[in-house]
């Protein structure tokens, strides 16, 4: 290398020693890159990463989120496991991945997370279910959904100095059928 008085072989050996045991990072990077462009083979590679509990939560969550772009029935069981993962980051990634499902299917799998212990997960579920009108659900479910939406609106309202908060609130209100309030937001 240019910064040491040693041969390239010395640098290569040092790098190999440093990165020993980290070969999985290459597979993860390749799967993520393929997932971002919906490349050939991305689905199975992402599904394998998402399903591996020994991997870091951030890797699994990213895999779930990207896997949703090309969701197949064969990976739906993996998503359901991800929604029950003990790590909220993995649950968050699984929720993001399931945004690709039609809203009527989304409600059925995400409803149990309306009361998730993690606020980040609950807020993501609120966005995923914003097209579901509480009035379309039985009274107990409607109350839970209304509470979730109130929590989401309060969270977005904390950042009203940001234009995207206004856009997010307007989108939610429009999804709920309140076009006049959406225009005001």
Q: Which residue ranges define each predicted feature?
A:
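Short coil turns that connect the paired helices of HEAT/ARM alpha-solenoid repeats
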Residues: 51-55, 83-89, 114-120, 157-161
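Amphipathic alpha-helical scaffolding segments comprising HEAT/armadillo-like alpha-solenoid repeats
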Residues: 39-51, 72-84, 102-114, 135-153, ...
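Short, structured interface segments
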Residues: 11-19, 125-148
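Primarily the internal scaffold of c-type cytochrome electron-transfer domains
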Residues: 1-58, 65, 70, 117-118, ...
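Structural detector for internal amphipathic alpha-helices that build alpha-solenoid repeat scaffolds
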Residues: 27-39, 58-72, 78-81, 89-103, ...
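Short, charged, low-hydrophobicity "junction" segments
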Residues: 15, 19, 99-106
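Long alpha-helical HEAT/HEAT-like repeat alpha-solenoid scaffolds in very large eukaryotic proteins
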Residues: 129-132, 142, 147-168
């Amino acid at each position: 290398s240019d910064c040491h008085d040693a041969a390239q072989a010395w640098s290569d050996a040092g790098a190999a020693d440093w990165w020993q045991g980290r070969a999985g990072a290459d597979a993860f990077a390749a799967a993520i890159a393929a997932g971002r462009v919906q490349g050939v083979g991305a689905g199975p590679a992402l599904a394998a990463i998402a399903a591996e509990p020994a991997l870091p939560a951030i890797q699994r969550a990213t895999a779930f989120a990207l896997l949703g772009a090309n969701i197949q029935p064969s990976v739906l069981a993996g998503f359901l496991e991800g929604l029950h993962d003990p790590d909220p980051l993995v649950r968050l990634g699984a929720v993001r991945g399931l945004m690709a499902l039609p809203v009527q299917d989304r409600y059925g799998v995400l409803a149990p997370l309306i009361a998730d212990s993690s606020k980040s997960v609950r807020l993501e579920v609120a966005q995923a279910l914003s097209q579901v009108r509480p009035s379309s659900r039985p009274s107990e479910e409607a109350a839970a959904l209304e509470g979730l939406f109130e929590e989401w609106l309060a969270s977005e309202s904390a950042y009203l100095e940001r234009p995207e908060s206004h856009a997010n609130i307007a989108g939610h209100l429009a999804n709920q059928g309140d076009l006049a309030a959406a225009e005001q937001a």
